[in-house]
Amino acid sequence: MRQLKREVKIGNVTIGGNNPIAVQTMLNVPVEDIEGNVAQAKRCEAAGCQILRVTCPSAADAKCIEAVKNAVNIPIVADIHFDYKAALACADVGVDKIRINPGNIGDDDRVKAVVQACQQKNIPIRIGVNGGSLEKHILAKYGAPVPEAMVESALYHVHLLEKFDFNNIVISIKNSNVPRMMEAYRQLSAVTDYPLHVGVTEAGTYQMGLLKSGMGIGGMLLEGIGDTIRVSLAAEPEKEVEAGYNILRAVGFAVAGPEVITCPTCGRTQYPCTEIANEVEKRLQGYKKSIKVAVMGCVVNGPGEAREADIGIAGGKGEAVLFIHGEPVKKLTGDHILDQFMDEIYKI
């Protein structure tokens, strides 16, 4: 059962409570390239990104934040490290949320200045704890970025913001070690009702990043923990968005758009099952209808394995049986099985 947290409004998206889990990503174009950032932001929006983070190393770089915000219709989060004046500049240009890393933002007075700027414009703050940048005294106390250390860091900064009468807060508590990350989120969720941004940081190269994020983020969601997610990949941010939605689908959340399932194939396969499945998925990119499509390797187990699909095929030599909701309907034959199948999909 989902652990319900207080609601926080980020631009036109509300997280927490019973609101849908929002999928985030972060631009990776150098901040000096404003045109490149705007173009990438538009691609992320088209891919379904719901909350978009942009780095802001200095106050002067707030102009990139402003340009991106004016170019898309999704909330923009300013990612702030070291320079609290960058956060103040982003608040001035109307950013929708500010993320600060407590380990490097500076002393309490600087945090207070950021809080006051956000209070004036009702801008939420994400406390972004990262296992790689814990405060020195906390790291010295625990010896390593163990879950208890990360939770202590997060709660210290929550209490600091609360001391300044600020509670428009989101928390993340990321680690590249999946078991540590999961245990940290469990401990944090047990002691706070602020919404949680869930992710695995420094997850590795693309394939390993997918695996670690699937295990870490998916595992947390299955435990009812998480209000917004970001899949960190060494890839274009659009791929992070796609992966985020796939994780939500995999753990049972209703997600708009099609899901393509296929079998791993075996020696019984007599038609290009994998190639057809990949092409079906490619052609259905951007298709908004929520349907499950199955492409199965043979008629032995195919229909049974894909019984819960809305539509599917199970192939044979030069033909494929079309089934709808697990029931065989007709045979598709010839050299254009894929095209015939796509025609049937669009009828569903």
Named regions from a protein language model:
Residues 1-26, 119, 282:
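N-terminal amphipathic alpha-helix/helix-capping segment at the start of soluble metabolic enzymes
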